[in-house]
């Protein structure tokens, strides 16, 4: 199982050209290429989840949770503590809160299921 690289690199003022990104929740890794979810993996076992509802879908945005129990849908890229929200291309899917956003190493990208 390859190590994931944190995206907390020094600031870069230009356009982000990286194609791959991994959104990490408590139990699951959501792997994206060019904004499309291409692989989902169980964090505990490292097993790919070929039937996951997020596969082949784009993020619609995120859901922000408030202490009073309120939820707020937010467009754009999710922030730490917000849930990923897949709202188009199938049933609505809301994940557990985001713990980190990372960049997958090349060897892990090569393992993505077809």
How would you describe each model-predicted region?
Residues 2-9:
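Charged, amphipathic alpha-helical segments
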Residues 8, 36-39, 44-46:
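An extracellular/secretory-lumen and virion-surface interaction module
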Residues 10-14:
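Surface-exposed ligand/attachment interfaces on beta-rich extracellular proteins
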Residues 15-22:
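Short, hydrophobic/aromatic-rich segments at coil-to-beta transitions
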Residues 21, 37-41, 81-85:
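Short polybasic amphipathic segments
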Residues 24-37:
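Short, solvent-exposed loop/hinge segments that bridge or flank secondary-structure elements
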Residues 46-114:
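Low-complexity intrinsically disordered segments
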């Amino acid at each position: 199982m390859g190590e994931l690289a944190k995206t907390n690199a020094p600031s870069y003022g230009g356009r982000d050209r990286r194609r791959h990104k991994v959104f990490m929740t408590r139990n699951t890794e959501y792997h994206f290429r060019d904004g499309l979810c291409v692989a989902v993996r169980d964090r505990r076992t490292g097993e790919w989840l070929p039937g996951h509802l997020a596969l082949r879908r784009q993020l619609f945005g995120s859901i922000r949770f408030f202490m009073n129990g309120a939820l707020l849908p937010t467009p754009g890229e999710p922030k730490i503590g917000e849930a990923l929200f897949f709202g188009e291309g199938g049933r609505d899917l809301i994940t557990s809160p985001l713990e980190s956003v990372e960049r997958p190493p090349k060897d892990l990208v090569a393992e993505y299921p077809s």
